[in-house]
């Protein structure tokens, strides 16, 4: 009987814990604090940006896609022409209780070359431009404040040319682009190394890069 009683107590504990978690989530929503939030960043090849955010505690999901242009439902082939207006982006779903938007922006800077216009590393064209796409006024203020602070403390001499612009319609990229660093690790490492991304980040940011 003792094992049965212990099991019952354990199940009772689990029930109470689950209730507490659901109550906490409901309370957070009642206070106007979303359980999840979105952030969107363009930092050149979306494979690399996706990998960077997949490592961040509090990030729930990342999706590679396109944003910033006027062409509806663009394909990768269309975007790579540089004529759609879209940039390769990664939309980040995160838990604001575990990671702040400001922290995500801070990580963004250290994974791009903010001095490079119309491209990132070995990839050139407006589709590879760097940009922060804000989803509300609070994100806009945080992004702009971060850029001002970086301008004063940056460890490099170049001018910061990264755009800060309002988010528009997000179009998810084709399935083979999603989680590319996980599905195709060898090809991904070959591309990233050949593109000189890590080397340039270290040159710009030192040990804080990447």
What positions do the PLM features span?
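Low-complexity intrinsically disordered segments
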Residues: 1-2, 20
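Flexible coil/turn and secondary-structure edge motifs
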Residues: 6-7, 21-210
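Bacterial N-terminal signal peptides that target proteins for export
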Residues: 2-15
């Amino acid at each position: 009987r003792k094992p049965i009683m212990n099991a019952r107590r354990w199940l009772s504990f689990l029930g109470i814990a689950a209730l507490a978690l659901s109550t906490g989530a409901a309370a957070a929503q009642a206070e106007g604090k979303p359980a999840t939030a979105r952030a969107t960043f363009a930092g050149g090849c979306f494979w690399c940006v996706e990998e960077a955010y997949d490592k961040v505690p509090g990030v729930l999901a990342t999706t590679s896609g396109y944003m910033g242009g006027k062409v509806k439902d663009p394909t990768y082939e269309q975007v790579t022409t540089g004529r759609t207006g879209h940039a390769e982006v990664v939309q980040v779903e995160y838990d604001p209780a575990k990671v702040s938007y400001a922290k995500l922006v801070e990580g963004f800077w250290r994974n791009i070359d903010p001095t490079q216009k119309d491209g990132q590393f070995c990839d050139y064209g407006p589709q590879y431009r760097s940009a922060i796409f804000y989803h509300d006024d609070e994100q806009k203020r945080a992004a702009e404040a971060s850029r001002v602070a970086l301008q004063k403390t940056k460890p490099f001499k170049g001018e910061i040319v990264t755009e800060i612009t309002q988010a528009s319609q997000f179009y998810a990229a084709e399935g083979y682009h999603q989680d590319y660093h996980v599905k195709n690790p060898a090809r991904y490492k070959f591309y990233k190394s050949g593109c000189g991304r890590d080397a340039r980040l270290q040159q710009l940011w030192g040990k804080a890069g990447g």
